[in-house]
A protein has these predicted regions:
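N-terminal, charge-rich interaction modules
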Residues: 1-33
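Generic preference for flexible, low-structure residues
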Residues: 2, 25-27, 42, 46, ...
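Short, intrinsically disordered low-complexity segments
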Residues: 28, 35-73
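Intrinsically disordered, low-complexity boundary segments flanking structured domains
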Residues: 1, 52-54, 79-80
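Short, compact, well-ordered microdomains
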Residues: 60-94
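Glycine-rich loops and low-complexity Gly/Arg-rich segments
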Residues: 34-38, 90-93
Length: 94
């Protein structure tokens, strides 16, 4: 799990034993759930785009979600949700 000093952490779409995580759109789903957590708080229409604090991406061809520390500073429960998602699904975190 991320250190307290980390400015971001990456949830990789690989389990700790190296299997690809399913469903294939998991990163977009997680980022979609987190879309309301953003600078200035939730606002009308912001569910149509990802939060800058929780963004789906690719790292070395592997789907991932990049989670910024600013999310923790704004809402520790949302941060914990992302950490617990990775832990509950046995996903690699960088």
């Amino acid at each position: 799990m991320p250190s307290d000093a980390a400015q971001e952490f990456v949830i990789l779409g690989l389990t700790r034993d190296g299997r690809q995580f399913r469903p294939t759109d998991w990163a977009e789903r997680l980022a979609g759930v987190m879309s309301q957590f953003r600078p200035g708080g939730p606002q009308r229409g912001h569910h149509l785009g990802y939060s800058p604090w929780c963004v789906p991406s690719l790292r070395d061809g592997v789907k991932c979600v990049v989670v910024q520390r600013a999310l923790r500073d704004s809402d520790v429960l949302a941060w914990d949700f992302c950490i617990n998602f990775a832990r509950d699904n046995d996903l690699q975190v960088a």
